[in-house]
Amino acid sequence: MFISFEGTEGVGKTTLIRKLYEHFEASGKQVVLTREPGGTPLAEQIRSLLLAVNHDEPMSSDTELLLMYAARAQHLQQVIVPALADEKLVLSDRFTDASYAYQCVGRGLSKDKLNTLNQTFVSHMPDITFWLDAPIELGMSRARERGALDRFEQEKVEFFQRVRQGYQQLHELYPERIKRLDATQAPEIVFQEALEHIQALV
């Protein structure tokens, strides 16, 4: 099974993923914990490029999108596809939905570009996706508490409001796959709700 986790900054994805990872490992399931951009040594190098703050040469939106998909292609081929072939449970912090929300709706890039990249490079889609949703101000406050902000975390509130709208659009388009979780709730409640959705699929 392939599960992805989406949301804007500071909504608690990492906490939920860790809880699910510990739960399924304890039950004897082979679990692969991964993330995007990243997940392989090469993809992690691309992640560093994407998150680095560079005032001398700002990254264009097209470059950002292409780097995301370069990392994604490597991640799929090296981690996700082999793990699924071995019938392991894959938990991925972000996947293709993030590119729609951040690069298409957030940055204003053409959906045709995204569709072409998906058709060309994305061989597998998640069985279920959890969208952790919370007010932007709450998430940004949590992100600031973690310390230095990366290039995305430094974006303005208006950008993240568009990203959140992008996730809402996806949730409405694919309600069977994308499940909204209220990330303002206690982490344990969010975990239990996610677990119920997963168990309903098994």
Swiss-Prot record:
Cellular component terms per the entry's GO annotation: cytosol
Keywords from the UniProt entry: ATP-binding, Kinase, Nucleotide biosynthesis, Nucleotide-binding, Transferase
Catalytic activity: dTMP + ATP = dTDP + ADP
Matches recorded under Pfam families: Thymidylate_kin (PF02223)
Keyword Nucleotide-binding (UniProt): yes
Superkingdom as given in the UniProt entry: Bacteria
Family membership noted in the UniProt record: Belongs to the thymidylate kinase family.
Protein name: Thymidylate kinase
Organism, scientific name: Acinetobacter baylyi (strain ATCC 33305 / BD413 / ADP1)
Gene of this entry: tmk
